């Protein structure tokens, strides 16, 4: 084999060169390796490796997410290469000769034509030769491809917006792992749901200064960021940066936490889960899971203790003291400290944080469960001294303020004076079949003539229908009519499935075309079992055509008219389905703005019992990016903040749902006015005061009354959210817990 000889002036070689030494496979060279030289070399490399390990242990949290190559030190690789050479075949050898040359160690290496090199000392006295293994480049080529360096992932910590107690979650982020910013949002949503309650999907990421992050390239390694759900603004709080070592908050540990905090929910509306009214509810707990004991304990505590509730707070200070209210739920009350933080943000003490809380009788509140017991009025104190003899006594003005609040929360029945209130007039007409069904089946006229007759009755022509609708569906009877639209029942020619065709007349909504565009845009985004699906949309100059899912039972208004009132079990099914639909909408930042019985379609069994409810008619729906001020909706179901024109958001849908639940149980709305006059009706709505009059409510439990009272809060800040409806014990079906409410 051809060998190249390289002359050197010195035997001084650094560790990098010695690590690449290998004997020539040629049989002409003696197979001897000076043990002393090898021992010194290996000892030097081991010492260097140990030193590197000590440094890396101090900074271990920066190495958790590195690739296998990036986390290995150079001395380790040198040592591995040297040991690899030592374990080679017997033909591999290194011969080191003596030299009297200088310490410059200068040498030259020419191109390699063979796999080995021979180095001959410059000094004449050196008779031995030095055979060198392949260069470092050739050694790297022998390293398996799995050790090829990859792009280092960024190790980033994410907090929940506004939650100063949540320790955060740390995950590796790279362009290879997340091809888009939306993919990162999806992963963060999943990870946060495993540890805390969040109101919806992660939509925005901020840095710790509140700057919005718009791409993966803006993320920096080792930095912390804040995840915001829906349209939340950045909340500048002191995030819990020192609660847990960074190395412990890894993606692996978060994924092992299989004890989901929302397992007791009837369904997960964010994941389009079906919520059948007849199916048994899932049980809480169900296994230990792989999460930490702390998380499991916190989850168990929340499941057994925390439920949506409004409490009254008395702020410490000069009498008469300020009195305010706070909505507690699973999102702001996962722990005792979280509740104190929520109280602090509401009462705004001059001394800073709330440190001590007492009941109205002066008992100190020390556990999370104390906030969800029989007491609903609490004193909030900071670091100031407490005068137990005077501070826990209420003045007359304070008594009156608390009684006014309790009046809005009253669930006891009162005797109804006068005749029974009536349901309002239906806000849209429902036509009877234009053609008798039996006569229609037996008609001998051509199909197109029947269609033409139906359309002519509405002022339309058969040729106006889009060809893809006319050729795919057969036209049936008119099933509904609104201010701007008419609805037909249609049937697919091939499958025989029934659908609804909504024809919107653009001439009737001049200047309001944006409502049509918003309806179509919103419905294209939606996919939920309790929301009517959009099958097809066709836009023409004069009309907009929407092919929609058809529900056989008609709307809820007609069902109420037929049965007058529903049982609690039937009402529970409907409010679950409506609550799930609203939660799904609100998680996407969409408000319906026109929830009423006419826009709720029901599916009935052969006995007339409600099996399923679906939300329809998104003509007024819109995306909420800020407070809305447009006055719209139906008078009976409109929320106080709409009438006051102070700005409103998602919770107006909860108010409307509360009105509907009230109607389902007794057959009439809580706010009525003589002869349907709007001014007295609006005054009653703004006051927020209503009754549960006997005998219509005498057989209805306190649990559902409590739910209605929380949904019909005039102050939107303390009104239930759509998720709170689903979390309420009555909705879940825990009757025992419902009976413990005290107002």
From Swiss-Prot:
The catalysed reaction is: L-seryl-[protein] + ATP = O-phospho-L-seryl-[protein] + ADP + H(+); L-threonyl-[protein] + ATP = O-phospho-L-threonyl-[protein] + ADP + H(+)
Instruction: Write down the top EC class of this protein.
Output: transferase
Q: Which residues form the Protein kinase domain?
A: 473-731
Keywords, alphabetical: ATP-binding, Kinase, Nucleotide-binding, Phosphoprotein, Repeat, Serine/threonine-protein kinase, Transferase
Residues annotated for ATP binding in this entry: 479-487, 502
Kindly give the SUPFAM superfamilies that the UniProt entry links to this protein: Doublecortin (DC), Protein kinase-like (PK-like)
Enzyme active site: 594
Q: Which GO terms describe its molecular function?
A: ATP binding; protein serine kinase activity; protein serine/threonine kinase activity
Q: Where is this region: Disordered?
A: 54-78
Whether ATP-binding counts among this entry's keywords is: yes
Set out the biological process GO terms recorded for this chain's protein.
Answer: intracellular signal transduction
Q: Which residues form the Doublecortin domain?
A: 154-240, 309-392
Q: What is its EC number?
A: 2.7.11.1
Tell me the protein family, please: Belongs to the protein kinase superfamily. CAMK Ser/Thr protein kinase family. CaMK subfamily.
- State the protein's name: Serine/threonine-protein kinase GD17699
State the species of origin. Drosophila simulans (Fruit fly)
């Amino acid at each position: 084999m051809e060998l190249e000889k390289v002359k050197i002036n010195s035997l001084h070689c650094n560790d990098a060169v010695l690590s690449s030494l290998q004997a020539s496979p040629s049989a002409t060279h003696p197979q001897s390796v000076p043990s002393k030289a090898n021992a010194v070399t290996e000892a030097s490399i081991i010492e260097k490796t140990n030193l590197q390990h000590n440094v890396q242990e101090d900074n271990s949290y920066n190495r958790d997410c590195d690739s296998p190559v990036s986390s290995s030190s150079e001395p380790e690789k040198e040592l591995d290469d040297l040991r690899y050479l030592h374990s080679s075949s017997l033909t591999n050898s290194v011969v080191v000769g003596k030299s009297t040359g200088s310490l410059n160690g200068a040498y030259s290496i020419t191109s390699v034509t063979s796999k080995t090199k021979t180095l001959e000392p410059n000094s004449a006295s050196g008779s031995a030769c030095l055979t060198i293994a392949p260069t470092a480049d050739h050694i790297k080529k022998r390293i398996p491809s799995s050790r090829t360096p990859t792009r280092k992932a960024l190790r980033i910590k994410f907090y929940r917006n506004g939650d100063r107690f949540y320790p955060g979650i740390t995950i590796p982020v790279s362009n290879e792992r997340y091809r888009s910013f939306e993919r990162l949002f999806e992963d963060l949503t999943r990870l946060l749901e495993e540890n805390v309650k969040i109101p919806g999907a992660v939509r925005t990421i901020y840095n710790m200064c509140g700057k919005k992050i718009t791409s993966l390239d803006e993320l920096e390694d080792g930095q912390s960021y804040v995840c915001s759900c829906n349209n939340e603004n950045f909340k500048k709080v002191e995030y819990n940066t020192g609660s847990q070592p960074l190395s412990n908050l890894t993606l692996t540990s978060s994924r092992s936490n299989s004890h989901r905090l929302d397992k007791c929910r009837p369904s997960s509306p964010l994941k389009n889960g079906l919520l059948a009214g007849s199916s048994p509810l899932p049980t809480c707990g169900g296994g230990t899971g792989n999460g930490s004991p702390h998380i499991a304990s916190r989850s168990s505590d929340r499941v057994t203790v925390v439920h949506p509730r409004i409490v009254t707070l008395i702020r410490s200070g000069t009498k008469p003291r300020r009195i305010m209210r706070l909505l507690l739920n699973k999102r702001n009350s996962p722990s005792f400290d979280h509740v104190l933080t929520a109280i602090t943000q509401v009462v705004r003490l001059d001394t800073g944080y709330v440190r001590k809380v007492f009941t109205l009788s002066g008992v100190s509140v020390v556990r999370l469960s104390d906030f969800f017991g029989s007491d609903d009025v609490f004193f909030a104190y900071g670091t100031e001294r407490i005068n137990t003899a005077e501070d826990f006594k209420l003045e007359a003005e304070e008594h009156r303020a608390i009684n006014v609040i309790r009046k809005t929360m009253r669930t006891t029945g009162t005797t109804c004076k006068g005749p029974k209130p009536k349901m309002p007039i239906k806000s849209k007409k429902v036509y009877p079949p234009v053609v008798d069904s039996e006569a229609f089946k037996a008609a001998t006229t051509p199909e197109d003539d029947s269609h033409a007759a139906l359309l002519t009755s509405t002022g339309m022509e058969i040729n106006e229908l889009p060809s893809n609708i006319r050729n795919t569906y057969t036209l049936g009877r008119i099933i509904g009519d609104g201010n701007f639209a008419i609805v037909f029942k249609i049937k697919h020619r091939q499958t025989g499935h029934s659908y609804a065709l909504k024809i919107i007349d653009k001439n009737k909504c001049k200047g309001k075309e944006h409502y049509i565009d918003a309806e179509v845009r919103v419905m294209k985004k939606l996919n939920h079992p309790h929301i009517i699906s959009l099958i097809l949309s066709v836009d023409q100059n004069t009309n907009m055509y929407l092919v929609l899912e058809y529900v056989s039972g008609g709307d809820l208004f007609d069902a109420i008219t037929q049965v007058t009132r529903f049982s609690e079990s039937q009402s529970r099914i409907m409010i679950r389905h409506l609550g799930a639909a609203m939660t799904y909408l609100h998680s996407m930042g969409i408000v319906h703005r026109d929830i009423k019985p006419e826009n709720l379609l029901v599916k009935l069994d052969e006995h007339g019992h409600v099996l399923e409810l679906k939300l329809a008619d998104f003509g007024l729906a819109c995306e909420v990016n800020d407070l809305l001020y447009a006055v719209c909706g139906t008078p009976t179901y409109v929320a106080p903040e709409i009438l006051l024109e102070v700005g409103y958001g998602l919770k107006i849908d909860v108010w409307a749902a509360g009105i509907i639940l009230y109607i389902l149980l007794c057959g009439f709305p809580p706010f009525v006015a003589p002869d349907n006059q709007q001014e007295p009706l609006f005054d009653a709505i703004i006051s927020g005061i209503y009754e549960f009059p006997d005998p219509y409510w005498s057989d209805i439990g306190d649990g559902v009354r409590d739910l209605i009272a929380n949904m019909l809060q005039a102050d939107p800040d303390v009104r239930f959210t759509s998720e709170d409806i689903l979390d309420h014990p009555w909705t879940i079906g825990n009757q025992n817990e419902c009976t413990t409410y005290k107002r």
